[in-house]
Amino acid sequence: MMERAEGETGKGRIVLATVKGDVHDIGKNLVDIILTNNGYEVHNLGIKISINEMIEKAIEVKADAIGMSGLLVKSTLIMRDNLDELNSRGLQDIPVLLGGAALTRTYVERDLREVYDGRLFYGKDAFEGLRVMDRLGEIRVGKLDVDDGMVPTEKELHRHRVAEQPAEPVEIPSRSSEATMDNEIFVPPFLGSQVIKGISLDDLAAYINETALFRNQWQFRPEVLPDGTKETDAQFKDRIRPTLREQLSEAKEQGLLIPQVVYGFYAVNADGNDLVVWSDETRTVELMRFNYPRQSAEPFLCIADFFRPIDSGEADYAAFHIVTMGAAVSERAAELFAENRYQEYLLLHGLGVEMAEALAEFWHWRIREEWGFADQDPEPIVGTPTQTALAGLFRQKYRSGRYSWGYPACPDLEDNAKVALLLDSSRIGVECDEETSFQYQPEQTTSALICHHPRAKYFVAK
């Protein structure tokens, strides 16, 4: 890990931005740091940036490339539109780098290269972005032929995709036969919503996914030991845990992590692909409804299938929650980044993200416990979860499904605002509306719909 150094403008210039409608910036900021430390002049425009703003800055600074980032599925569509705009304005001489969790190499280097008339590259991570910029620099000074070794072969692309076969037309049923309705309906302890504050950070820390934190957020990797062998996973985690304890201690001392939850249980029914939320068990007043996509191939699943249909004569139940670590951790992380204190920024931001995920996991367990089926977990949790119990949680080895918006089974981010309205998230300082691009603020906030159906697991609807 390294602190940020000022770039040398002679090596090249790049404009970086998170695309319009997306507020995620950790990946983009990491690219900023790596490129700056390797001598590039980086113009980081921030989040929710329109293509017009990127173009204006690129022309102003005579940028050698534009880098676009985005975490959301819909951001991939924004990127496509941005490439069209660059074409229409005759700016296809500007190389473009695309990165983000929703992108794949095949989508960028095969599909989107058919859209953009200029040079387009996929940045799997910050270091691949650096390699692309280095090679573009070699092209500019004549050390490398244009695109020499930079365009993947069909064989290389094939390694990154599943072979595609022409789909035969199929008749899509109104419900999946996999989600049978012979399951017990668990009646919740109350209807409506409640606010929970004062949750112990020590209790939450026990639910941290150390692999996600240490490797994905903090970018640590196992080291080679003196005998030439690589650290085992246990040795690797033992080495990094003191850093985790130190970060947690500092965050507690500074009051940066304030866990809060608003959650509730509601009477619901499925109406085709819709989930109808009722005001009470009489099912006479509809509060709102959520629409979910259905798979176009077997087993034709849709989230609504996990609930009793509206014409069944029975009320079913769903839980919703919004969990947050508060605004202070995001604000402090932004200050650290602005001060070029990269290592501290990366550690604190990653901790905030994974503590929010830990809170979601912890509260999902609490909901299962209150709902009456936590004892069906392979290893029921009593007090602090064991490592075996945690591994089961992270692999969804429990009864219940927890679905968050923005993923393929429930992609509509506007539903985040519905959940915020349903639970009155303002009581825990969480906002979500068109002004926030239907993403929760503060950043370290997440929400979910929780099903009790035993077959409710993660799946992709497409």
Go through each PLM region and give its residues.
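Generic, well-ordered alpha-helical scaffold segments in large soluble proteins
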Residues: 1, 22, 33-38, 57, ...
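ATP-dependent carboxylate/acyl-activation modules
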Residues: 1-68, 274, 293-301, 305, ...
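C-terminal amphipathic alpha-helical interaction region
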Residues: 1-4, 8, 14, 19-23, ...
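Active-site lining segments that contact anionic ligands and/or coordinate catalytic metals
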Residues: 11, 63-66, 91-93, 117, ...
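Conserved structured core elements
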Residues: 25, 29, 48-52, 60, ...
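Cofactor-cradling patches in redox/metallo enzymes
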Residues: 28-38, 42-114
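Conserved phosphate-handling catalytic cores of large alpha/beta enzymes
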Residues: 82, 86-91, 95, 100-163
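Active-site loops and adjacent core secondary-structure elements that bind or stabilize anionic groups
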Residues: 127-346, 350, 371-390, 430-431, ...
